Structures are given as C-alpha cells and as structure tokens.
C-alpha cells in the first residue's frame, strides 16, 4: 500500500487567506479565543487525511480545545492579519497525552506531532509562503529548529521534546519575530493565520492534546 503524506498546511492555507477576517486595530494584546462559548466561527478546519476531532472541554478546571487524532490529520486555523514587529510574542498553554513512537522530525513518514502551534506568513507567490511551527517534538532536542522534511519554507522549532512532561500543562511564550529571523535569516512579512494541529496520519498512531487560549502580545 502506498503511504500517503499530507501536504504542509501552510501551503494549502493560501487558498483561504485572500480576504482576512480580522484585523487588530488597537495597540493591545490579542486573545484569539477564550473558548467560553465553544469554538468561535473565526476558527476554520482544514482536513488532509481524515479529521482530528477538536472540541471545547473543561480539563483540570481550564476551558480548552481538546484534539484527538487517530491516524488523521486536520487543523484549526484562525485568520488574523498582524505584524510581528508590533505583536512579537506568541503565548499559549498546552498538554499532550503522549508523543509518537514513529515520529521523526527529519523524515516525511515521521512528520506527525501530538501538538503544534504555528503561524502562517502568506505571500502572493505561493512558493514564498512560510510558516513557523512550534512543536512538541518526538526526537528533536528541545530548543533546536530544523526545516520541515517536505519543504524548507516551514521551520519546526522544538518548544518541548520527548515524554518528560507528558500529562502536564505547560505555559509557553515565544518571540515570533526573533524565531522567524533565526529560521529564515530575514525579517518577516505580515502574518495571516495562527493554527493548532494534532496529526498522526503519517505514523498511523494516536494522540490527544489540549490547547489553552492563544494570545498575541503587543510589544
């Protein structure tokens, strides 16, 4: 049987980003969603192979999105136009049930993650669209960054790695502006979307992740 690999999400998002649904107008921090009324309509789902189940739940007293993947790959993305120079910091909380035994950041057949949060930087020239992926890595050491095995236009940054903190809520804060510069050696254009994704289609495994509210912090 031929192994199917999902196309990197940030490329497909080009078809959904010509008209952005939200533009931050005031100089203040941006909370994408607090999940108090379910998942807002600003979030859209893109399926690649099967569908990861995304639902709002109460987990450890926190409202969050629970993602359940069983050999599937789909993502939730939130269209938002913002300048990383004005909103350089990305903040979120997450928790995973497990990492993926067959997951490998260097191989196409291992390009699955129990959890990832990423930012898409669209371009009118599709081959110039880029993405910064913050991953809960399977093998890549924490703090390291590598190109996605499908394309060098997607940078994979291991914010967490391995099983040490499985089952624990972790708070993350990343300097998106600096991460983009380190990944691609240049200043970023405006961003067009923030996405969350739990995918296991390439490895055929299972994973559950919980995502707390995502915020963009004003400089």
Language-model regions, residue ranges each:
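Extracellular carbohydrate-recognition regions
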Residues: 26-47
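Solvent-exposed strand-to-loop "edge" motifs in beta-rich extracellular domains
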Residues: 93-99, 122, 177
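Extracellular beta-strand ligand-recognition surfaces/modules
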Residues: 112-117, 152-162, 166-208
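Bacterial N-terminal signal peptides
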Residues: 10-21
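Extracellular/luminal beta-rich ligand-recognition
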Residues: 110-155
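Extracellular/lumenal carbohydrate-interaction signature centered on repeated Trp-anchored short motifs
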Residues: 79-90, 163-166
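Extracellular beta-strand elements of beta-rich domains used
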Residues: 35, 194, 213-216
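Short carbohydrate-recognition loop motifs
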Residues: 55-75
């Amino acid at each position: 049987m031929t192994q199917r690999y999902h196309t990197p999400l940030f490329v497909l998002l080009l078809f959904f980003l010509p008209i952005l649904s939200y533009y931050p107008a005031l100089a203040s921090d941006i909370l994408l969603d607090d999940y108090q009324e379910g998942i807002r309509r600003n979030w859209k789902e893109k399926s690649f192979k099967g569908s990861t189940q995304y639902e709002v739940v109460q987990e450890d007293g926190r409202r969050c999105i629970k993602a359940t993947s069983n050999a599937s790959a789909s993502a939730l993305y939130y269209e938002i136009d913002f300048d990383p120079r004005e909103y350089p910091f990305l903040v979120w909380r997450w928790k995973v049930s497990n990492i993926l035994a067959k997951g490998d950041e260097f191989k196409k057949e291992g390009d699955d993650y129990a959890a990832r949060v990423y930012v898409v930087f669209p371009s009118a020239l599709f081959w110039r669209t880029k993405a910064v992926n913050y991953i809960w890595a399977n093998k890549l050491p924490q703090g390291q960054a590598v190109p996605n095995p499908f394309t060098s236009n997607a940078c994979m940054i291991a914010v967490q790695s391995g099983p040490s903190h499985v089952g624990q809520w972790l708070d993350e804060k990343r300097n998106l502006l600096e991460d983009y510069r380190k990944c691609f050696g240049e200043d970023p254009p405006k961003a067009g979307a923030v996405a969350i994704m739990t995918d296991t289609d390439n490895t055929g495994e299972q994973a559950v992740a919980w995502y707390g509210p995502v915020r963009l912090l004003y400089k």
